[in-house]
Amino acid sequence: MNQLLCLLLAATPAANAMAAYIASLPQEIAALVATDDCQLPDEFSIQNFVADSADGGKTLDSYEFGFLDDSTTVDTSCLFNSTSKAVNNDGRTPRYSCNDARVNFIWQNGSLTLIEGVCAGEDGAADYEASGTAPVAITCTGGNGTTANNATATAASNCKADSADIQAKFFSIQPAPPKFE
């Protein structure tokens, strides 16, 4: 009996968070979820983040990582390098597409923001976007064999996340902006 009570008490914060998340949704999204026409994401994983940096990790010249969302079954790889083109040009922070175009990302100040298109409309395009941010602590190994945590080396560096699997939650859902052509 005590184990069941402990389990219920441990699950209460997660249940309350999900209830608050659903309660804060616009009416039309809540209606889609109620009819099973839309699967809202809850959590995501950033996997195997690696990067190259010419300044020891202060800025990243290129990086790649995996994105996994079990709730929507989206599993894709993401890459940024010198040939990457932003998928938006509307004055917002530039975002870049993963291999699965439903997922975009922004690297800023040591964090990755992931944006996942959800609730496809009649045209097949996502009507809404869920977004969440995860800090990505990195360690860089410089060309001279030195190791620097979060960007203190000065030689060309290979960098990787301190964790191979970074868990994060989506915290926002908004109407999808018009597509950039």
Model-derived regions: residue spans:
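Generic low-complexity segments that are intrinsically disordered, proline-rich and/or Lys/Arg-biased
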Residues: 14, 27, 42, 136, ...
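Short, surface-exposed loop motifs enriched in S/T, G, D/E and P with embedded aromatic residues
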Residues: 24-25, 76-78, 170, 175
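Conserved beta-strand elements of beta-rich interaction domains across eukaryotes
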Residues: 12-14, 70-72, 119
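Fungal secretory targeting signals
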Residues: 1-25
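Short, surface-exposed binding/anchoring microloops in extracellular/periplasmic proteins
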Residues: 31-89
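Immediate post-signal-peptide N-termini of secreted proteins
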Residues: 17-38, 180-181
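Acidic, low-complexity intrinsically disordered segments
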Residues: 89-181
